[in-house]
Regions:
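Short, Lys/Arg-rich flexible segments
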Residues: 1-156
Length: 156
């Protein structure tokens, strides 16, 4: 097969998958599977709205590119993979001053680490709908290619 059919398939896949993954942000879920809700305390501080969108920086940071025979999605935000995959991780709490509510005395809290659990809120990855979209793209491009071959054959 000519190289440009691969390029066309990969280019179409890149556009379609980017659209599908950004739709996951709008739908607040991964192809119909709703994300785990945030804690009530977080909702009160931030107000109502989308679970993963406060400033929109993570959604805007998602980039897609074609590398070889694959479409690759990247982000320059360090927390993107953490949200997409979920998991436990350690956070270092810096030393700081705290004032006691009872006595009014100020004391220093030493630096320490705390375990955090991030629930998975996947928005990029393999899914049945991704496979269906890719299948549709390949089928459409192969039909166009075979039609061009038939037209060229009939002209000669």
């Amino acid at each position: 097969m000519p190289r440009n059919i691969y390029d066309n398939i990969l280019s179409d896949a890149r556009v379609k998958l980017t659209e599908l993954f950004k739709d996951n942000f709008r739908q607040q879920g991964f192809f119909g599977e709703k994300w785990v809700a945030t804690k009530a305390s977080k909702t009160n501080k931030r107000g109502r709205g989308s679970i993963l969108i406060v400033t929109g920086a993570m959604r805007r940071s998602i980039r897609s590119m074609i590398r070889g025979m694959a479409v690759v999605f990247t982000s320059d935000r360090p927390y993107t993979a953490l949200h997409n995959d979920g998991g436990n991780f350690a956070v270092t709490v810096r030393s700081h001053s705290r004032t006691s509510k009872k006595t009014g005395n100020t004391y220093t809290v030493r630096s320490h680490s705390r375990q955090m659990n991030m629930p998975q809120r996947q928005f990029i990855g393999d899914h049945e709908k991704v496979q269906q979209a890719l299948g549709d793209i390949v089928f459409k491009r192969l039909q166009e290619f075979s039609q061009r071959l038939a037209d060229d054959f009939n002209r000669h």
